[in-house]
């Protein structure tokens, strides 16, 4: 898997394992997280501006404590636009989504950002075949949860890391000693399943909530979640 979990796990596993094989179905956009130790000045800034930051979280569409630019992508010349992309790439984290106001709402604006990200990833990954597989995106930037990473794409420059494109070479079978694809067999000691999880509805379903007429929430949501305004469920305790 190469969603947010796999993207975090792969670089760390690659440092310890003699050999790592990553099986990718869907390539994901990712921006460097730029994690670092919180400085004394930053801590003081947050404490001194806590209420303002809290208000900002409530005001922004994505619920994060950073402002989304009021500028539209094509309101500025290309050279200046590229400079802005570079600036936000260096900042890292989720802020890249806020570099321009229309990235998530305008297809051409999104294409501009996507092309930049594809270029940056291709610059990082030295193996051209891997770079092509990792940037063969089937969705606009931000339309799936965009992960952030620490040295994820750099990981594919290591000699002990191998990438398998399971769209071209699908997994057929997993047995006791490894994974069989349509064209190859990969003998493995350990398999890490980073294939996703039921993040939103899973917790509620596992509570075994029962409503009117002994109807179980799991059965009620059998064909997908149904709510009132995303807050209440008809016929169940709310």
Which ranges hold each PLM region?
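Aromatic pocket-lining residues of Rossmann-like dinucleotide-binding sites
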Residues: 9-13
């Amino acid at each position: 898997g190469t969603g947010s979990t796999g993207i975090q796990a792969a670089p760390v596993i690659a440092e310890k394992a003699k050999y790592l094989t990553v099986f990718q179905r869907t390539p994901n956009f990712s921006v460097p997280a730029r994690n670092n130790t919180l400085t004394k000045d930053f801590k003081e800034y947050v404490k001194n501006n806590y209420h303002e930051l809290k208000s900002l979280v409530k005001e922004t569409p994505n619920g994060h404590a950073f402002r989304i630019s009021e500028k539209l992508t094509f309101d500025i010349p290309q050279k200046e636009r590229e400079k802005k992309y570079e600036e936000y790439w260096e900042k890292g984290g989720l802020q890249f989504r806020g570099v321009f106001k229309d990235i998530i709402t305008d297809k051409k604006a999104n294409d501009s950002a996507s092309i930049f990200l594809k270029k940056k990833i291709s610059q990082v990954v030295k193996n051209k075949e891997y770079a092509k597989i990792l940037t063969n995106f089937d969705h606009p930037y931000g339309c799936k949860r965009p992960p952030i990473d620490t040295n994820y794409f750099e990981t594919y420059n290591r000699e002990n890391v191998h990438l398998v494109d399971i769209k071209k070479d699908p997994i057929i079978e997993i047995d006791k000693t490894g994974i069989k694809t349509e064209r190859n067999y990969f003998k493995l000691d350990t398999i890490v399943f980073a294939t996703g999880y039921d993040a939103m509805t899973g917790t509620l379903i596992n509570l075994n909530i029962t409503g009117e007429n002994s109807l179980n929430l799991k059965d009620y949501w059998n064909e997908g979640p149904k709510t009132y305004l995303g807050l209440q469920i008809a016929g169940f305790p709310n």
